[in-house]
């Protein structure tokens, strides 16, 4: 993934963009990951490896998934849960619909 974004950052630079965010695109439809448990593990692995993308010199943005299949009626707990994993991986910008919950979680962790 880092190789791909390295090439994209070079292209952006040639087009005049000096700074932006690296966004691996989590939270969107995965046609190749239909099994929700496999998809969620892939997303968590990507969150935990955000620090590798930060080495490219741009901050990392991650969209936090709902994971309805796993969280069911407690779906509003999913994004705060994933925010912990993303924070541990070094995510800089968290895309969330649960701003107060995620903010409280990150403040409690003392990382942001």
For each predicted feature, which ranges?
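Active-site-adjacent loop and "lid" segments of alpha/beta metabolic enzymes
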Residues: 1-10, 14, 27-112
């Amino acid at each position: 993934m880092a190789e791909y974004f390295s090439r994209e950052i070079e292209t952006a630079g040639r087009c005049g963009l000096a700074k932006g965010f690296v966004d691996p695109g989590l939270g969107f439809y995965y046609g190749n990951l239909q099994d929700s448990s496999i998809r969620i593990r892939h997303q968590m692995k990507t969150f935990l490896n955000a620090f590798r993308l930060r080495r490219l010199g741009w901050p990392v943005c991650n969209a936090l998934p709902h994971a309805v299949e796993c969280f069911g009626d407690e779906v509003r707990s999913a994004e705060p849960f994933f925010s912990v994993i993303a924070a541990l991986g070094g995510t800089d910008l968290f895309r969330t619909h649960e701003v107060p919950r995620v903010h409280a979680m990150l403040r409690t962790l003392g990382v942001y």
